[in-house]
């Protein structure tokens, strides 16, 4: 069997050109490196070196073994780093940014998966809507972020996203309110975060009206309370309605309107195993999440477009 240290001596000789340089790089004497090379030649049964003046040079067999040896050493180095990373993942901390409805519906599943597989890994939760969450991710303040978008775009330079699920949008009204999104000009609207507001504007324009905003709140519980009080209508995603449903509102699904929910991490390689563990836990939680379709109080959908 080939000894790793002997293989490393051959690789260093190939890289540096002389036994003395290889010995200095490895921290051994020239005599020790020469013995290692001779032992490697005996172990393989191949002539690896030939005399060249006062020094030596690699034979064709020596060059071939050195090239393959570099691959083996690289693999060993990666394996060692992964083992260290795994040990840290089993007893460390990762930071996850998440928007409110994800905290209520998706994050509990993420924490459950991590807790079962890596009980020593602590997940620190940071509340943040997508723009702020992605900015925190780029700045290294969090390790991953749960995000959403209403168009199929990438997360941005230096980031990579993994699709988790598609979240249907619902028209939320008080009893006696509008029943079709096309009638949106007849009422005022309660809107949410910046991205949610942009989507409301886009949906409204696609259905022939520009929404008149009455109030804005990132809190989906508050939004439903305002709708129930007759302040206006709202668009809310299924994740929010599955986490909390006010008894005083009616909901109708919007055909063809949904948002893409994803987990985003920095596109770095190699990446700490703890972050990979967190991303995979998000994928597992996404697969397990069964978004309860909110009951439609009056029947039918609020067809859009």
Regions found by a protein language model. Give the residues of each.
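Flexible hinge/capping segments at coil-to-helix
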Residues: 156-193, 272-273
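A short LG(V/I)-centered, amphipathic sequence patch enriched
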Residues: 41-60
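Central regulatory/effector-binding core of bacterial HTH transcription factors
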Residues: 91-153
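Secondary-structure junction motif
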Residues: 186-208, 229, 271-279, 286-295
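Short helix-boundary/capping micro-motifs
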Residues: 11-30
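Beta-alpha-beta core module
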Residues: 154-163, 167, 221-270
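Hydrophobic hinge/microswitch elements
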Residues: 129-134, 138-142, 148, 195-250
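A late-sequence structural motif
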Residues: 178-179, 250-300
